[in-house]
């Protein structure tokens, strides 16, 4: 068999990869995890369990919901519907087709259900199976995730944002002294389940403990304890210890000496040893823990206390008469002086009392005695009355309600996470499968709450990431599914009871619409299902990695306090402390850190390198915030020697609570993987982030997401090394699916013959259709360009095509431009930006924006609307761009008001005049009974038509344009099929040739003689089909040929079948909305050049608006004549403290000067003045070891590499581990520049040098989405507000500009009374004045008069609503 590796003539594509000079010192042991894996794992792996066999599916996600809802039985238990398995069919349309046809990308869910019918004997009650029916039931279309982690819903791309919410479990906290005037801390506990009722326990100001369910009226906690079955005695014995007082004749009582009960208190009486009678300490003295320990060690067992000491203590068991066994006082009662006398009289020798002291307060006992409920029944009825006020309370109903509240798995679910948290907080050992409350839980929650009040333990920190978890897509949709299936369950039970069960099939019982509507509602309207931010690839990735605290079950903006929004020590390595929106959502919407991932319980984990005996290993361990608290963790920049040992006497480590300690190297457990793990993806793209102020870094990371993809992309000279990862994971670029060789390339597609052979040894073919000028969600342009050439050898996951905002496989949001920091005639006042005309002329910051316009031809009451060129009362000039069908041509240049699609609508009949009758008789009916309802280009839009899509309803005849588009599409499908077949045929026939050459012919086509030996020349004379007719002597060869033919035929048949399916789908017509006959979509591309008013920004939060475009000859220039592109204001730096931009500028200056140096060396090499060794030496000096792979290649390739860096050398300065100031100076020296990075600059207008040296360098600038074209508009005639009669505001309403209070002051200051009057009356809301002014303009006059503004009338009406009748009285002067 021929090996495909034989004919790899190509050089690997990896040779084209960009090499950056990296300033990082820390060796990376862990790769950045896939940036959108959070979305894909959650939905595809955990929820759908898509490509997993039914038998291997775990009980989670969809599987667990179906298992929990089914089996469903009817009320009489005769019918039983069980779940067997589920599977997904293939989606009807692929992702691209769904977005084009405005459909949802979804797959039909087929669930196999088994209906068992039972026969029940009425006398004996025995059951036996009567019949079993199993059937596959369609349960609706379930949205699928695209390969980029998004959903296509109704044709638009949406993202489901992960939600941060409080983890289920029990939480203890206090009110910080806010409730009670004395500042006393009132402690409380809250049990938060994943699903079910909340349980709160709280102390009041009198130290009585209450509980409430779902924030209803509060009850005594002992009512709850009685409701779970505890008696008074059990309650007291569980929460209190007991001590026995023994009577010592004529001396008092002897009691066991327990040091902790009396330490740190002044003695009220002498401390006497009961056994010896010795006085150990006098009254009034303080007993210290050391003294107590000493006495205990010396054998002090019992101490003597005075007789009346018992007064005020509480009984720990019933006090009984020794003679009659009569109960004298109940357990828990306080011993009074009277009771003590009774004890003396009856000569009771032993009295058991509760241990109550400052370490153990009487709260439970006090609550017990305040509570009127004395038994379980009364307690349950009391709870019932609070939860169901107005309903009669009986014990069965109360019992059932209480059980359903906390102990029923159907209605209450703590979830596995909640159980784990509960066990760890209460120190219990209950199985993780028990996800309801237990009696032990409730008893121990009260115990811990009382201990907190007694000063033992600490309260929980709600903002700790161990107490907040992430609900990702899969879990959010799982919850919706559960709601839908619970609703469906009710309808199934109803149908079971209603129909004849014997004849019914499973599909008759299931109504899938209920489930579908719930899922649809979630994707369309939920606060967490959002329209994807698709401005550029970075904004897509960030949106998918966003964590929101808002949404259903989360916080609300208005009630979220400062603590929730603040950065917490546990955010380190998990949530980015920088990237969050400015404004009211600050801190509520966060971004996951670069290396963070979410574990199976929903907690965010961060990676660390394990340290063993002071030696750093390469083992990477992911820890959650809870686990991290147990260890000492060093920083990534801790000094490590060659053997991997931590250097230095002490290492700075993080410990629980966010504190830092200095420990010896052998005590360190872990160190950070990299300093970059602290920040998010957007922040990790900012070079010199460590030199920027945090507020500006926040703006920088937010503004990168608003950068518009430009026509010409340009990766930053000064990057951070993460650019490639972002481009790859965003899905903007095209990745090779398999190793292979490029067979064909054009701007629309790439064909690759793969090197992974099939079972039959034949190659498979990958065809990548590139996206050309597609519209994104934010009207930016998605366009992919191939990076490979024919013959290139590509490896799996190599980038073979660039997408929007990517350059050679790296993210490129802006352009490198030459900037100078200097004031220029006041044009860069307040962050304004001055740009050179070259930038506009050479389209440096030009971007393409695509607008979509849609017209629908509907079936109306009066008849169908029609797409046509035949429009009444429209000139031929207006129709010049339309084809014969009435749809605009592709490539037409259009401006506001032009017709895109001609459409006429039937109009109702109106009475006809005799003249009209005559005209109709002469010219026919048609022209009069329709009105023009064509699609026009809206105001403010102009550009080129780049695409037209026509969709026709099934059964409606297609027009010429639709047929032409269809034909074009079929040709494309056919080309894909033919190219694939050609590659397979080439392989098959060259294999056949190898087998046949040298064989002896037995039989064959006419051209060949029997007995002849086959040669290559002979085979060249035969057609491909005749190869199969040859029969040779060797039976083994014939067998092999037979196998090849079978495989070839199968392959060909499969290709034809796939082609036929695609064509059939294309020709079958479209599913259009109700009443629509035809839909035409027109896409117009507009080129936006940079102009004054556009917003630009750097990566460091330095933003500004363009103030002026200056001719090149007027701009400042360098001594070699290079003109500066952009002039920025140096005053924008000191107060903003984003110094990173200056370091970036200096390093950029080194970059272009090093590139010039390399170009000079290449020139000298070509002129044979120097050899290749000098170039190699300079490259090693510049790049270090990074460059070795290139230096080993032939000379031409080294020169070709040098040419690639001729515009600028690319640097990588990783966040917190990048170039220091000295490194920048070294680079400037290597480039032959002054280490200050400043140069002499010449003024373009005068030709003279500026007085001082100026900072000049290459800087990376972005053009943001806030374009002046989309902001400014002018109003001529437009709508007025109904009440005030003033023009509306805003571009969308075609509004006017408000002449506000300050503008009035300006006119007053100038004394321009008439102008002011005109502004406030006729130009605003004087209705009569407006009409008169219009009349006078029409008559060509210049005079007008103002009347009363409408707003004055509104004010009078407002007065009248207050019952004040205000009139305007005009008296003649």
Curated annotation (Swiss-Prot):
Q: What is its EC number?
A: 2.7.7.6
The protein's UniProt keywords, in alphabetical order, are: DNA-directed RNA polymerase, Nucleotidyltransferase, Transcription, Transferase
Q: Name one GO cellular component term.
A: DNA-directed RNA polymerase complex
- GO BP term, pick one: DNA-templated transcription
The UniProt-reported impact of residue 109 to P is: In strain: Moroccan
PROSITE patterns, A to Z: RNA_POL_BETA
Enzyme class comes to: transferase
Q: Which GO terms describe its molecular function?
A: DNA binding; DNA-directed RNA polymerase activity; ribonucleoside binding
Is Nucleotide-binding among the key words of this record?
no
Question: InterPro entries from the entry?
Answer: DNA-dir_RNA_pol_bsu_ext_1_sf, DNA-dir_RNA_pol_bsu_external_1, DNA-dir_RNA_pol_su2, DNA-dir_RNAP_su2_dom, DNA-dir_RNAP_su2_hyb_sf, RNA_pol_bsu_bac, RNA_pol_bsu_CS, RNA_pol_bsu_protrusion
Cystine crosslinks: none
Q: Does the keyword Transcription apply?
A: yes
Q: What is the effect of changing residue 931 to E?
A: In strain: Moroccan
The reaction(s) this protein catalyses: RNA(n) + a ribonucleoside 5'-triphosphate = RNA(n+1) + diphosphate
Q: What does this protein do?
A: DNA-dependent RNA polymerase catalyzes the transcription of DNA into RNA using the four ribonucleoside triphosphates as substrates.
HAMAP family in UniProt: RNApol_bact_RpoB (MF_01321)
Instruction: Please report which protein family the annotation says this sequence is part of.
Output: Belongs to the RNA polymerase beta chain family.
Per UniProt, subunit arrangement is: The RNAP catalytic core consists of 2 alpha, 1 beta, 1 beta' and 1 omega subunit. When a sigma factor is associated with the core the holoenzyme is formed, which can initiate transcription.
Descriptive protein name: DNA-directed RNA polymerase subunit beta
Per the UniProt record, the source organism is Rickettsia conorii (strain ATCC VR-613 / Malish 7)
Gene that this sequence comes from: rpoB
